[in-house]
Amino acid sequence: MSTKIAVLGGGAWGTALAAMAAKGGHESWLYARDAETVVAINKDRRNPCYLGDITLADGIRASTDAAAVVTGADAVLAVIPAQAMRNGLSELGTLIPQASPIVLCAKGIEQNTGRLMSEVVAEILPDHRIAALSGPSFASDVARGLPTAVTVACEDANTADRLAALLSGPAFRCYSTTDLKGVETGGALKNVLAIAAGAAIGRGYGASAQAALVTRGFAELRRIGQAMSARPETIMGLSGLGDLMLTCSSSQSRNYSYGLALGRGEDLTSRPLAEGVATAPIAAELCRKHNISAPIIDAVGALLDGKITIDEAVTALLNRPLKTED
């Protein structure tokens, strides 16, 4: 029986997920606003704006008609930036059949409300099943069919299991969980920590400082996860520790690259805004609300606000009172 996977969003990640679905033998539909992108994908098997050096699988069908893309879909992957998710699904959500679970593929916290993506979408589409896909995965790797493992989360266990089975393919392995908020928390907060890791390398502090920031940053992530009722195994898993390791160590990460540029003192005005920039102040406020010690996240927020320099941030972190390791 043929299965259909619909992808909303013609950027790098949306294109990669559509390619993954096609390689898995599914009927893969991709919605993009740009007509030229749609023509190029259908005719040349390439997205001229993203991943242009990768030939895409033949099974992808791109369209500017969102209704045609989502009709009859066994799953709808919403690959919309976190800060645009509310508007995007307010516009497109009414087209999505209620029987089709919506899989959120953006990692972030809404800036104005402090809500996770699943909470935002639940307000807009309260009658739909909502899931999230997260884990250590770069779009170029997935589009090329390189081995990748991620987590699919939905509060309904049967839906989580079905989605994991549906989305898993020859080189794309999905683990299922019902810990939706835990998966989203790890995916959002690792972006902030990646900026810190990139800034340390960009400033020339070296790999030892990078390792310390990532490790102590993970301790902050665990504390926040506990306050958010995330399961420990979720934070220790692919969507937590796994994603943190990848994002904090590769220039393919937009957040890490942003931190690198920040550390080098480069002009950031023309650089695409990393999701961690929007998440940092929200994460810092979340920690204050729950009385969580998160000095690295606090430092990133202050750094991005221009309140301190990188050198001042590192000095302050090193001069904190000594304590036992947690």
Swiss-Prot record:
The record's keywords, sorted A to Z, are: Cytoplasm, Lipid biosynthesis, Lipid metabolism, NAD, NADP, Nucleotide-binding, Oxidoreductase, Phospholipid biosynthesis, Phospholipid metabolism
Q: Where does the record say this protein resides?
A: Cytoplasm
- Location of the active site: 190
Lineage of origin:
Bacteria, Pseudomonadati, Pseudomonadota, Alphaproteobacteria, Hyphomicrobiales
- What is this protein's function? Catalyzes the reduction of the glycolytic intermediate dihydroxyacetone phosphate (DHAP) to sn-glycerol 3-phosphate (G3P), the key precursor for phospholipid synthesis.
Q: Does the keyword Protein transport apply?
A: no
One biological-process term from Gene Ontology?
Answer: phospholipid biosynthetic process
In its UniProt entry, what is this protein called? Answer: Glycerol-3-phosphate dehydrogenase [NAD(P)+]
Enzyme superclass (EC)? oxidoreductase
PANTHER family attached to this UniProt entry = GLYCEROL-3-PHOSPHATE DEHYDROGENASE (PTHR11728), GLYCEROL-3-PHOSPHATE DEHYDROGENASE [NAD(+)] 2, CHLOROPLASTIC (PTHR11728:SF1)
EC numbers, comma separated? 1.1.1.94
Example of a GO cellular component annotation carried by this entry: cytosol
Q: Which reaction does it catalyse?
A: sn-glycerol 3-phosphate + NAD(+) = dihydroxyacetone phosphate + NADH + H(+); sn-glycerol 3-phosphate + NADP(+) = dihydroxyacetone phosphate + NADPH + H(+)
Assigned protein family: Belongs to the NAD-dependent glycerol-3-phosphate dehydrogenase family.
**Residues reported to bind sn-glycerol 3-phosphate:** 107, 135, 137, 190, 243, 253-255
InterPro entries attached to this UniProt entry:
6-PGluconate_DH-like_C_sf, 6PGD_dom2, G3P_DH_NAD-dep, G3P_DH_NAD-dep_C, G3P_DH_NAD-dep_N, NAD(P)-bd_dom_sf
The scientific name of the source species is: Brucella ovis (strain ATCC 25840 / 63/290 / NCTC 10512)
Q: In which pathway does it act?
A: Membrane lipid metabolism; glycerophospholipid metabolism
- Where does it primarily localize? cytoplasm
Per UniProt, where does NADPH bind? Answer: 13, 33, 107, 139, 254, 273, 275
Show the GO MF annotations: glycerol-3-phosphate dehydrogenase [NAD(P)+] activity; NAD binding
